[in-house]
């Protein structure tokens, strides 16, 4: 029996396909508790095709690697728990290697849930590490600038393994499918810039399906792109302790229908957008195309303890981006922030922010929907004048039904909302041709599969 693969639930359980076909008595030490039920403990490496099913519970204990070009398939309705009792440096997380795949294809009625092994009421951010996908798509973070881009192969944060072209550039690389998936109480920070996010996407290619994903109460960023070409639709990042959505290292994917809801006590930016913080000129430039997003901060005037960044959209380190149909509200620092390194990109027409609404950003008694600072780089740049000079941008109440309810938010638009019309869909086949502004119109695509537990 391949003991590095996994141990199944039961006193005489049949091993799943790919881990052998014989039966074996499982000693009690190999069982655990997941959401109050007995579960099989998964540890080490999954090296052959394996399937997890909804009639059982599973505990991820320590780093669980899917490797050797194996595919891990998780059936709709399956619940997996990250072992919260692991020590700091042996944090539990699911790590999908280069050339391996994760097929977690849930449904609206049967989402796949990754959560903490602690009982309901005792769960908290950082209980486990989250999910890491690593692919072969392009990145702009070479270890040696004298080598060609196809040779780039660098180590992911938290020693998760190598990622990048690693000998062959594959823009359409596939790491599998994540659809109708919830990831709760995950993330772990070992040191600054040495972190696990709830969902970390390292050089993930456009052949990967990422649709209907919620990350909730993670200790670091909700979803972060480290280069690559991955596309993401119908995403909710709620109550995460750092940024809701973060990208760097040359991410050039597409996104539509995203929601960010920051926690009322701690939480940073809605978007933290970078090209490369070490060298803003590196190519490929981060240049995503993103439409129909609702970014909700902490509520106007709320300043969380210890948080120094409360910006709706932070455009930094030479990033390019095409952003449209955004709602940005409730960020207690500013709605839109520009770093000086991004000025040249905006002046060259490589950054756009259009058909968007900004409302009640800034501290109580002030309005800072857009940064009022005039930056002086190679050329003076008035952030407010630039943003409000872009087509279709307004400072107006989007009239969301109940946006700042932490446990039962309602993000659809009220009758008469200025966001019901005026949206312009991007000219790209990836995007659904809706004309509302923000992530939701009058239909709530988050209903039925998302959840917002406090603990």
Give the ranges of each region predicted by the language model.
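Bacterial N-terminal signal peptides that target proteins for export
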Residues: 1-9
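C-terminal motif of bacterial Sec signal peptides marking the signal peptidase cleavage site
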Residues: 16-18
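Extracellular beta-rich repeat passengers
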Residues: 23-76, 81-101, 105-107, 111-220, ...
């Amino acid at each position: 029996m391949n003991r590095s693969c996994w141990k199944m639930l039961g006193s005489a359980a049949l091993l799943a396909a790919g881990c052998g076909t014989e039966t074996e008595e499982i000693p009690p030490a190999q069982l655990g508790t997941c959401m109050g039920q007995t579960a099989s403990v998964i540890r080490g490496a999954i090296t052959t095709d394996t399937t997890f099913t909804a009639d059982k519970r599973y505990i991820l204990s320590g780093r669980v690697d899917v490797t050797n070009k194996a595919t891990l398939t998780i059936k709709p309705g399956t619940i997996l728990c990250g072992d919260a009792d692991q020590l700091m440096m042996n944090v539990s997380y699911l790590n999908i290697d280069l050339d391996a795949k994760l097929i977690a294809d849930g449904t609206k009625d049967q989402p796949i849930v990754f959560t903490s092994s602690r009982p309901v009421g005792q769960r908290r951010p950082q209980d486990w590490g989250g999910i890491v996908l690593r692919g072969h798509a392009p990145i702009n973070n070479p270890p040696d600038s004298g080598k060609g881009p196809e040779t780039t192969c660098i180590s992911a944060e938290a020693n998760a393994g190598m990622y990048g072209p690693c000998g062959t550039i594959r823009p359409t690389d596939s790491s599998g499918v994540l659809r109708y998936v919830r990831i709760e109480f995950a993330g772990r920070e070992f040191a600054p810039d040495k972190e696990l996010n709830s969902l970390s996407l390292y050089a993930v290619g456009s052949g990967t399906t990422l649709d209907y994903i919620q990350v909730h109460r993670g200790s670091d960023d909700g979803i972060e792109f480290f280069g690559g070409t991955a596309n993401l639709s119908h995403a909710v990042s709620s109550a995460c302790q750092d940024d809701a959505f973060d990208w760097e290292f040359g991410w050039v994917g597409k996104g539509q229908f995203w929601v960010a809801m920051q926690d009322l006590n701690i939480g940073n930016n809605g978007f933290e957008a970078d090209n490369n913080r070490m060298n803003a000129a590196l190519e490929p430039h981060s240049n995503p195309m993103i439409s129909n997003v609702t970014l909700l901060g902490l509520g106007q005037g709320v300043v969380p303890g210890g948080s120094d960044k409360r910006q709706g959209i932070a455009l930094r380190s030479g990033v390019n981006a095409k952003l449209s149909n955004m709602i940005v509200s409730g960020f207690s620092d500013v709605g839109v922030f520009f770093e000086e390194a991004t000025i040249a990109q905006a002046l060259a027409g490589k950054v756009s922010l259009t058909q968007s609404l900004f409302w009640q950003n800034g501290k109580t008694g002030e309005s800072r929907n857009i940064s009022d600072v005039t930056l002086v780089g190679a050329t003076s740049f008035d952030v407010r004048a630039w943003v409000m000079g872009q087509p279709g941008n307004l400072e107006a109440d989007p009239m969301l039904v109940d946006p700042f309810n932490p446990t039962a938010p309602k993000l659809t638009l009220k009758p008469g909302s200025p966001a019901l019309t005026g949206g312009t869909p991007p000219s790209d086949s990836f995007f659904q041709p809706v004309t509302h502004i923000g992530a939701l119109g009058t239909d709530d695509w988050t209903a039925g599969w998302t959840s917002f537990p406090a603990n």
